């Protein structure tokens, strides 16, 4: 099955699945995605100029390659030419309508969800965008790896699987991976200046935002008042040259509300504050767990606000696209725990580790909470262009202490552009699940709530009940119990581990479970002094 939001080209001709035929083959194609440079691809590959749907260019290019006996080049098209986020499945049948090949592929960050069975068993092949799509399937189900294309060749009696890792963003190496023309003339000896780094980051961020402003439906912007979402909204407003619609979600006295209000006033947006009470937040947790298909503590906490604001946008506006600010905390190593990093190399490598796993956590949260309400989420600051640009910085210059604030290199490129109020541009990191709350933190409200939802006896036997990533708190136990009620105990391993702070205050890797809220860290109070 396929549910289409019709963000690009809402005509009947763009309904999926797409079916393309010639004398030798039939191609059936399904894609959950947005291909932002589809018009450039139409021109470059000399495709039919009547194509209006962005996703349709992919099977059309594949058909063209097949007709030229060059289908082996399809992976290079995805790797080097396509700009966007996607999860797609392509079926190729021969002229006798016998299935010959299945190709499945996911963007290299994993913005769009895709699950699959790692081995072909029970005489079936499962590919689904949600766990809910395979509730009756008894075998192992896992995340389809981002940045991979898997080709199932069925032309012979035995199915042959060819898995290709096409991702390139993790190959980025500082400091000499940009400015290729200069490198060619100076034999790799050139060290970019600060101004060149700042300019490159400014360009990459702007490009990443602008790519995601193309839509046939109105766009909403989630605005927490943090530097990430504020930059996205401010740059979009400047590019579009019109007042945009911004939304902030929180409880009364939530710290995000004031900062978001200041940004909205600065950029002149139509701003809406979606206020919820602790009781309203607690009431949606069961459906949040079902929606995001996760038992991870911090993911559930942060999902509540995003779930509530997305519900509001869906019910009270005509917006269908939602731009969010997720990504820089992982890319730019800006979680407050990174002040504890033992050295620059450890910090730089941990950024790659966080981004490689972001599809299990923040990306899953954003995609599911938004799409739950018939909306499409877009994540500009996880664009590979921006990631490569930022990761070209030397590791030591990404350390929070380098300039006395986390992600200085993301803030500084826009310091002289009069985009944002100074206090917003330099606002310290505040987790989404913390920023929605006021004097009493959201995680404390939840912990009080679950105190009588999980018994002491249940906690005493937690290791026996849930031996995989055993819940260490009543809050974690409550989420796990909900997850297993919806999806069964066999699906727990969909999530590889709890999201955890990387280091403790002594620069040692964290062992065992610690609360993921930044407000529990000593560095939180230190950076507010």
Which residue ranges define each predicted feature?
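N-terminal glutamine amidotransferase
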Residues: 1-29, 34, 72-192, 206-210, ...
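Short histidine
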Residues: 21, 31-96, 222, 228-233, ...
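Short, polar/flexible loop-turn hinges at active-site or ligand-entry regions and domain interfaces
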Residues: 44-50, 68-69, 134-141, 192, ...
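Short secondary-structure junctions
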Residues: 47-50, 156-163, 493-494
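Active-site loops of AMP-binding adenylate-forming
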Residues: 62-68, 129-134, 289-293
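ATP-dependent adenylate-handling active sites, centered on carboxylate activation for C-N bond formation
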Residues: 93-96, 101-103, 111-114, 118-120, ...
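Conserved S-adenosyl-L-methionine
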Residues: 163-166, 420-431
């Amino acid at each position: 099955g396929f549910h289409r939001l019709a963000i690009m080209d809402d005509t009947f001709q763009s309904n999926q699945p797409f079916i393309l035929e010639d004398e030798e083959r039939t191609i059936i194609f399904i894609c959950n995605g947005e291909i932002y440079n589809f018009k450039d691809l139409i021109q470059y590959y000399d495709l039919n100029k009547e194509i209006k749907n962005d996703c349709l260019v992919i099977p059309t290019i594949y058909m063209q390659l097949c007709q030229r006996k060059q289908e082996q080049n399809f992976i290079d098209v995805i790797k080097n030419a396509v700009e966007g986020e996607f999860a797609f499945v392509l079926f190729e049948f021969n002229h006798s309508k016998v299935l010959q090949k299945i190709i499945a592929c996911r963007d290299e960050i994993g913005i769009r969800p895709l699950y699959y069975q790692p081995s072909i068993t029970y005489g079936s092949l499962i590919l689904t965008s949600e766990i809910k799509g395979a509730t009756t399937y008894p075998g192992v189900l896992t995340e389809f790896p981002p940045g991979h294309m898997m080709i199932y060749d069925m032309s012979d009696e035995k199915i042959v699987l060819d898995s290709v890792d096409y991702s390139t963003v993790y190959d980025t190496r500082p400091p000499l991976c940009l400015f290729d023309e200069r490198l060619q003339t100076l034999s790799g000896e050139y060290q970019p200046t600060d101004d060149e780094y700042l300019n490159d980051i400014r360009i990459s961020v702007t490009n990443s935002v602008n790519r995601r402003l193309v839509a046939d439906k109105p766009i909403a912007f989630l605005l927490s008042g943090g530097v990430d979402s504020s930059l996205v909204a401010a740059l979009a407003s400047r590019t579009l040259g019109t007042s945009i619609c911004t939304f902030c979600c929180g409880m009364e006295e939530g710290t995000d509300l004031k900062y978001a209000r200041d940004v909205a006033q600065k950029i002149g947006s139509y701003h809406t504050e979606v206020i919820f009470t602790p009781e309203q937040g607690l009431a949606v947790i069961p459906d949040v767990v079902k929606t995001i298909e996760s038992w991870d503590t911090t993911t559930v906490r942060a999902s509540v606000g995003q779930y509530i604001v997305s519900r509001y946008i869906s019910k009270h506006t005509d917006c269908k696209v939602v731009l969010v600010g997720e990504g820089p905390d992982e890319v730019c190593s800006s979680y407050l725990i990174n002040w504890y990093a033992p050295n620059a190399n450890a910090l730089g490598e941990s950024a790659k580790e966080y981004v490689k796993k972001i599809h299990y956590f923040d990306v899953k949260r954003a995609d599911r909470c938004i799409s739950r309400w018939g909306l499409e989420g877009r994540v500009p600051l996880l664009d590979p262009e921006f990631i490569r640009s930022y990761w070209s910085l030397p590791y030591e210059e990404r350390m929070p202490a380098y300039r006395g604030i986390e992600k200085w290199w993301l803030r500084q490129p826009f310091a002289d552009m009069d985009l944002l109020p100074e206090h917003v541009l330099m606002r310290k990191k505040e987790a989404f699940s913390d920023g929605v709350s006021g004097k009493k933190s959201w995680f404390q409200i939840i912990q009080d709530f679950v105190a009588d939802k999980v018994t002491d006896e249940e906690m005493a036997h937690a290791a026996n009940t849930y031996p995989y990533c055993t819940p260490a708190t009543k809050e974690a136990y409550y989420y796990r119990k909900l997850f297993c009620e919806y999806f069964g105990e066999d699906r727990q391993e969909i999530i590889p581990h709890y999201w955890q702070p990387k280091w403790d205050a002594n620069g040692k890797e964290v062992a065992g479970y610690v609360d993921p809220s930044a407000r529990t860290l000593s560095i939180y109070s230190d950076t507010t002094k």
